[in-house]
UniProtKB/Swiss-Prot annotation:
This is GTPase KRas. Keywords: Cell membrane, Cytoplasm, GTP-binding, Hydrolase, Lipoprotein, Membrane, Methylation, Nucleotide-binding, Prenylation. The gene is kras1. The keyword Transit peptide does not apply. Residues 167-188 are annotated as: Disordered. One of its GO terms (biological process) is Ras protein signal transduction. Its EC number is 3.6.5.2. The lineage of its organism: Eukaryota, Metazoa, Chordata, Craniata, Vertebrata. GTP binds at residues 10-18, 29-35, 59-60, 116-119. Residues 186-188 form a propeptide. The modification Cysteine methyl ester is found at C185. SMART domains: RAB, RAS, RHO. It is a lipid-anchor. A motif (Effector region) lies at residues 32-40.
């Protein structure tokens, strides 16, 4: 069974834990209890493949930012979460993305942009803004509500699909490099 290491990042209070718990336990946690770091595992079937999701729910609070490098090193894919009613959390996405790319030492890291709390009427981040940002990053965008469960499975499953695509691409690039290295050279 394939295991996928997913990391949920974003500012404090955007609903990272609520999204994760909704996926794992099928219920909504409405009280806010800042996370330091929690790990969850769930077996699911995505596109006919049984897989194990190893999900790391991270601290959004700035005082825990030193821990970020460590979990970013081990993660294969990242859900970058902001709240649609919190413009600052949307602006913070740039910072998280840059940190992930720096730690992974790669421009090409599987990510999904997630706009959470779409059940709330007090939107300050327009859907088009988020779609444009995701497009500029070359990553998918999904709106979710941990409360109503809208888009929750889709967000995590899309990230798994992004990781699969990335692994396939890396595998093909590896094969191309091997083919190139088999060329013969004759010295006279």
């Amino acid at each position: 069974m394939t295991e996928y290491k997913l990391v949920v990042v974003g500012a404090g209070g955007v609903g990272k834990s609520a999204l994760t718990i909704q996926l794992i336990q099928n219920h909504f946690v409405d009280e806010y209890d800042p996370t330091i770091e929690d790990s969850y595992r769930k077996q699911v079937v995505i596109d006919g493949e049984t897989c194990l999701l190893d999900i790391l729910d991270t601290a959004g609070q700035e005082e825990y930012s030193a821990m970020r490098d460590q979990y970013m090193r081990t993660g294969e894919g990242f859900l970058c979460v902001f709240a649609i009613n919190n413009t600052k959390s949307f602006e913070d996405i740039h910072h998280y993305r840059e940190q992930i790319k720096r730690v992974k030492d790669s421009e090409d890291v599987p990510m999904v942009l997630v706009g959470n709390k779409c059940d709330l009427p007090t939107r300050t981040v327009d859907t088009k803004q988020a779609q444009d940002l995701a497009r500029s990053f070359g990553i998918p965008f999904i709106e979710t509500s941990a409360k109503t469960r809208q888009g929750v499975d889709d967000a995590f499953y899309t990230l798994v699909r992004e990781i699969r695509k990335h692994k396939e691409k890396m595998s093909k690039e590896g094969k191309k490099k091997k083919k190139k290295s088999k060329t013969k050279c004759i010295l006279m």
